[in-house]
Each structure stands twice: as C-alpha cells, then as structure tokens.
Design a protein with these regions (language model features):
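Primarily recognizes the serine-hydrolase "nucleophile elbow" in alpha/beta-hydrolase
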Residues: 129-210, 289-297
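N-terminal signal peptide c-region/cleavage motif recognized by signal peptidases
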Residues: 14-17
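Short beta-strand/loop motif that positions the catalytic acidic residue
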Residues: 215-217
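Active-site glycine-rich loops that stabilize anionic/oxyanionic intermediates
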Residues: 79-84, 158, 219-221
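C-terminal catalytic histidine-bearing segment of alpha/beta-hydrolase fold enzymes
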Residues: 238-298
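Serine-hydrolase catalytic machinery in alpha/beta-hydrolase-like enzymes
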Residues: 26-27, 33-52, 56-59, 64-71, ...
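Bacterial N-terminal signal peptides that target proteins for export
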Residues: 1-7
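Conserved alpha/beta-hydrolase "acid-adjacent" motif
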Residues: 222-228
Length: 298
C-alpha cells in the first residue's frame, strides 16, 4: 500500500509539472488597461478551435528557451488572422517552440483586433501600439528572462507581418500619451522576420533606419508575395541588410512549414535559423556558445 501511495504521489507531481509546462505565464502589457480599451479589458477572450478573438487586454505569453540552450536572444511572435482573430497555435505557439530549439526565448503577442466585429480599434494606432509596447515591455523585463535587450527581434505572420512592418520600417507616431517607465524605452526592434506579410505598411516610410530583415513568402500568394518582394527591394535599395525566400508552388499560410508537403516549405524554419546564426543574433556578447548548442560547422 505504501508503494502504491508513493506511486500515486509521484504521478500527481508529474501531472502538476505537465500542467505547469502547458500553461506558460501571461502578462498584460498595460496593468491598468490599454489606452482606449480600459472599459473592456475584463471581457473574456473568445477561443474557437485554436483561434482567439475579442482581445481587449493585450498581453504577452512567455515561452522560455531551455536553460541549457538559451543564448539570450529574444523574439516577439505576432500571429496573423486578418485582424479579425489570431491564429494562435500555428502562427504563435508553434513558432515560439521552433525558436526555442535554437535557444531563443519567445514572447507571443495578443494584440487588439481592428476588424473584429464590434471593435473600435485601428491597425495603425492601436494594434501597432500594442507591438511597440511589447518591444518596450520585453526590454524592461529582459533581466528577468535572461535575454539581451539589444538582441530582440519581432516576427510577424500575414496581418502580424503588417504590424512588424509598421513598427520596424515606419516612423513611430510619437511617444504614448500616457507614459510610464516602460514607455520610455526604445520600441525599435533589433531585427525583423516577416512571414508572408500583408500589404499594409508597404512601401515603408523610414527604411533607412530599419533593422535587418528576413522575409519569406510563397510565389503563388497573390496577397502577400508582392509586398514581401517590394519591401525586400526597398530595404536593399536603402542599404539595409535583408534576405528574401520565395517558395515555388506555394500559396499563403504555410505557417512554420507544418501545413505543406513541399520539403522546401517544411524546412524554411531552418533557413531562418541559418540567418539568425549568420547575423550573430544567436551568439551572446561574451562570445561563448551556450551549452548544448552545436557550432554551425558541426
């Protein structure tokens, strides 16, 4: 009986540990509510399958890299969904776990949805403000999560890519009206990753100061291949380091490759990992590779 009791206790502890792993911490970007959304911040989000909508309290979900592999780099993941919903799993958590594999700690953003029925938000003024606040928030809390505030990137899918372009490649409309210590930090990311980005924000208006970019899209994507190509040409023309991958016979929403049978699509996250490594974002400033991460030559 005693052995059975011990076994039951161990099973319970394992179950608790699994539950903790399945529920990463979530933090509101504005403790008192996002500007203009204070009255609706307590409304519950709507979750249908793996899609999230009715977001009035913007937040970050923290998905930490394993301590043996973490190298101090951080990326804010911005899911798409046409500004009506968020493709939370395939363009959020799956992307975060993929980044974890190369030692990057991820922060998945829930932002206000301008095209959600009943919403009064705008993409340029509210959703983009949520991403800017997220960049500042991660910098303010960098020490808590063991990340380098100078190796912070943003990664956006489709509509999320529009927010990335608005924030990284276009001038900030000025400091927020309601300032706190977080708002005083820079909202400019150190690098940007655009995955079949939407057309809003392209052509960009401030590419001379834009951060280095990795851009990926499908050649059959009538919506988002043209802005991907156009932004790449604009960045390179302004002397900004940029890398573009356009995949043949590929349309929109191939996510992290898991929705395609084409090997080139399946392996595009490896090309992103190569770019992150080649650009130096995965190397701590002390020059020492983290334990458990092989060098590119291995």
């Amino acid at each position: 009986m005693r052995i059975q009791s011990i076994a039951l206790i161990l099973l319970a502890l394992c179950g608790q540990a699994g539950a903790q792993q399945a529920a990463p911490p979530v933090f509101s970007l504005w403790p008192e509510g996002a500007p203009g959304a204070e009255a609706r911040r307590a409304e519950p989000e709507k979750v249908e399958n793996t899609y999230v909508s009715n977001i009035h309290n913007p937040s970050l979900t923290v998905v930490k890299a394993n301590s043996r592999h973490a190298n101090g780099a951080a990326v804010i993941v911005v899911p798409g969904g046409g500004h009506r919903m968020l493709v939370w799993n395939n363009e959020g958590m799956v992307a975060a776990k993929s980044l974890n594999r190369v030692g990057v700690t991820a922060f998945v953003l829930k932002y206000r949805l301008a095209r959600d029925p009943g919403a009064s938000y705008s993409i340029e003024n509210d959703a983009a403000a949520d991403l800017r606040r997220a960049v500042r928030w991660v910098r303010a809390h960098a020490a808590e999560y063991g990340v380098d505030p100078h190796r912070l990137g943003v990664m956006g899918f489709s509509a999320g890519g529009e927010l990335v372009s608005l924030v990284a490649d276009n001038p900030e409309p000025g400091l927020p009206a309601r300032q706190d210590a977080v708002d005083k930090l820079s909202a400019r990311p150190d690098f940007q990753v655009l995955v079949y980005p939407g057309p809003l924000g392209v052509p960009a208006r401030s590419v001379q100061n834009a951060p280095p970019a990795f851009i990926v899209a499908g050649s059959l994507d009538k919506c988002c291949m043209p802005p991907a190509l156009g932004l790449y040409q604009q960045l390179v023309g302004a002397g900004v380091s940029a890398e573009l991958h356009l995949y043949a016979e590929t349309d929109h929403a191939f996510n992290m490759g898991q929705r395609s049978e084409r090997l080139s699509d399946v392996h595009w996250p490896d090309r992103l990992a190569d770019w992150l490594s080649d650009s130096g974002w995965l190397i701590p400033h002390d020059g020492k590779a983290p334990l458990g991460v092989p060098s590119p030559a291995q």
